[in-house]
């Protein structure tokens, strides 16, 4: 059974150990030791990182996991393959570990305050590179978050002790104080006490006092599902780097605005109003162009019986071409519009024309090759031919259908 030194002293950064088992795959290894300061991933806390050094090898540990009671140190091997029984030195990535300890203790404080103020239970927790998240079983808003944040950071400033105790059997007086219930306990249970603020079971590593958490800052929150809200936050030195990132983004965004004075939300709304005004003007101009273009196309139309067929090589994108075609045939009775270029074909007709555009396109594709589909009034696709060939075949089919 591995000796879990990280529980005895979570501040220990290096120790000696002995290799129990080695599993190698290419340039990576999984190593089991007789004792370790590396915490394995679990309970929302990531596995530890660091270095394992032997006489003629070095393992850059990228992750630590637990499987069937064994702790595996996983990483890239440099040098010879480690041997069972070999003595090694473990060096913990302290910045990574300590940041996770700050985050984990911070989470306990935040969850305790949310429970106390709003009776919200924490149902999920995960630590990431520069932030952590919890999920709670109820709705939150900014007023609630700001109140909770103030309470949380008062607790941090008060420098309350963080005490971890292990029990074979949980005393009733402790069980009554738990923030979350313990159902199945197969072995010793670890209880984390934070002053008179929180008592909860936990298998993670924690700082010794609330002051070490530094600060807790909620970054954002949002609804995850019907009764589940996610809150993202950061703690300690990671909070400083995360807030610097956010502030650089904030001031950089503000610097791009015509009016560079805060608040950013007002500047964004000003830009949105300008964009909306320009979009309305663009739409007005588009309609004017369509009107002009429609009149020009009608003059170029070919009479097929009582109907006017317009063929045109159009370079607009499909979306704009389709919008124009629908508008054009709606305004002009007894018309058929055939648009084509190297990328697409688009056939549209006024509702009064007794020919299906879907069937017309299918006939053209059957003869020239391609693919497409649509409705009786509008069809589109791609035909393996030049626009002129497409128009010739389509006109021939239309004359046949309209019995001209």
Curated annotation (Swiss-Prot):
Location in the cell: Cytoplasm
Keyword field contains Metal-binding: yes
Keyword line: Cytoplasm, Metal-binding, Zinc
Pfam families reported in the protein's UniProt record: DHHA1, tRNA-synt_2c, tRNA_SAD
SUPFAM superfamilies: ThrRS/AlaRS common domain, Translation proteins
GO cellular component term, pick one: cytoplasm
PROSITE patterns attached to this UniProt entry: AA_TRNA_LIGASE_II_ALA (PS50860)
Matches recorded under InterPro entries: Ala-tRNA-synth_IIc_core, Ala-tRNA-synth_IIc_N, Alanyl-tRNA_Editing_Enzymes, DHHA1_dom, Thr/Ala-tRNA-synth_IIc_edit, Transl_B-barrel_sf, tRNA_SAD
Cofactor, how bound (note): Binds 1 zinc ion per subunit.
GO MF annotation terms: alanine-tRNA ligase activity; aminoacyl-tRNA deacylase activity; ATP binding; metal ion binding; nucleic acid binding
Residues annotated for Zn(2+) binding in this entry: 104, 108, 202, 206
Organism superkingdom: Archaea
GO biological process: alanyl-tRNA aminoacylation
Cofactor: Zn(2+)
Keyword Zinc among record annotations: yes
Family, as annotated: Belongs to the class-II aminoacyl-tRNA synthetase family. Editing domain AlaX-L subfamily.
PANTHER family the record matches: ALANYL-TRNA EDITING PROTEIN, ALANYL-TRNA EDITING PROTEIN AARSD1
Role this protein plays: Functions in trans to edit the amino acid moiety from mischarged charged tRNA(Ala).
Name of this chain's protein: Alanyl-tRNA editing protein AlaX-L
Organism of derivation: Pyrococcus horikoshii (strain ATCC 700860 / DSM 12428 / JCM 9974 / NBRC 100139 / OT-3)
Taxonomic classification: Archaea, Methanobacteriati, Methanobacteriota, Thermococci, Thermococcales
